[in-house]
Amino acid sequence: MSSSSRNLSQENPIPRPNLAKTRTSLRDVGNRRAPLGDITNQKNGSRNPSPSSTLVNCSNKIGQSKKAPKPALSRNWNLGILDSGLPPKPNAKSNIIVPYEDTELLQSDDSLLCSSPALSLDASPTQSDPSISTHDSLTNHVVDYMVESTTDDGNDDDDDEIVNIDSDLMDPQLCASFACDIYEHLRVSEVNKRPALDYMERTQSSINASMRSILIDWLVEVAEEYRLSPETLYLAVNYVDRYLTGNAINKQNLQLLGVTCMMIAAKYEEVCVPQVEDFCYITDNTYLRNELLEMESSVLNYLKFELTTPTAKCFLRRFLRAAQGRKEVPSLLSECLACYLTELSLLDYAMLRYAPSLVAASAVFLAQYTLHPSRKPWNATLEHYTSYRAKHMEACVKNLLQLCNEKLSSDVVAIRKKYSQHKYKFAAKKLCPTSLPQELFL
């Protein structure tokens, strides 16, 4: 390990600013996330490392909590930078880029829903589990989630019948009267605010797809540490990719970009936003306050302050309602599994070739089939509200399945650990099928 590497240990903890009295939204200061490590600037090291230096192993440790000390968490990050300085090609599952424009979309049949009778839909899957849609995790362990039965009860909706999921006009959070128009606008907006599909090869020379995965894995832990909402995480990743599309960056500033984008997304999405000093602290004070503010200005100006971006999480919420159909009790396991699969897609640079709405629809498809392999995972309701037929999702679904089944590196385990908790129904421990029958996509 390099002598200049920072090591956050229990014996010599970095002093934490006294934020407990003013920032009640943050966790206990003892439960601290170690900095990203060797792909960042080092506080006491050189800001301009020699070109021949390569990434070395780094150990990150979690500090002591007030209740009991936690075991050290070490992570070996050997990213294998090539001697030529060029990033290796990102373990692409296919060299074929699927442009959004080539995907055939179904036309919404609004007249069909307008003429159909109002259907009762009392339970909303987006409201049933606060741990998914808000940053306040469930702390009442007395609540016992009801696990859906995987047996076929014979009361499934007719596959050819479209269920009106916008019939509940009494719930203002659903915006039932405007939902169709809102999501039509989001479908147009997602095309205009997508990052380049090959920016790593065209623009970047100091970073590669593996470094991007480690950064996003670290951002997942930062979001958990400060209890930020999932929407904040998805927005931060979008800002990172869009900025990297047109700006070459060295590996020493990659963490600075990531934590700055998380700060921007938190300002946009959160009610209780961590201070700039909190984001400096989470990097082990590797970066100064002024550096974060300068990077914030650079990101905002490059994005032209266009921060409203539809992410896969936006579409996933509506698609899960469509998957629920007429069920009065939402399937929490299905929701958590779909969220897990969608979040896994953030780690894979190759998944950028798929539109966010396609990723969300594919996650619902795979979650439905994983939990109910004897049923058809796609029906007329899902086809109508997602505008995707099963055949359009084949490549994306198979890539998600590969992500779910492959043994991830020890450097990117945050998402799997997150969804192995009880509040997420242990979704990460659910075994996905090894393969998918071809008739599912006919």
Curated annotation (Swiss-Prot):
Q: Where is the composition biased (Polar residues)?
A: 1-12, 39-63
Its annotated compartments are: Cytoplasm; Nucleus
Gene3D superfamilies, alphabetized: Cyclin-like
Which SUPFAM superfamilies does the UniProt entry name for this protein? Cyclin-like
Q: Where is this region: Disordered?
A: 1-72
Keyword field: Cell cycle, Cell division, Cyclin, Cytoplasm, Meiosis, Nucleus
Output the GO biological process annotations, alphabetical, semicolon-separated. cell division; male meiotic nuclear division; meiosis II; microsporogenesis; mitotic cell cycle phase transition; regulation of meiotic cell cycle
Q: Which SMART domains match?
A: CYCLIN (SM00385), Cyclin_C (SM01332)
State one Pfam family annotation: Cyclin_N
**What GO MF annotations does this protein's record show?**
cyclin-dependent protein serine/threonine kinase regulator activity
* GO CC list: cytoplasm; nucleus
Where does the protein principally reside? cytoplasm
> What does altering residue 283 to I do?
In tam; alters male meiosis progression
Expression by tissue, per the entry, reads: Expressed in roots, stems and flowers.
What exactly does this protein do? Involved in the regulation of male meiosis progression.
Q: How does it assemble?
A: Interacts with CDC20-1, CDC20-2, FZR2/CCS52A1 and FZR1/CCS52A2.
Which family does the UniProt entry place this protein in?
Belongs to the cyclin family. Cyclin AB subfamily.
The protein depicted here goes by the name Cyclin-A1-2
Q: What is the lineage of its organism?
A: Eukaryota, Viridiplantae, Streptophyta, Embryophyta, Tracheophyta
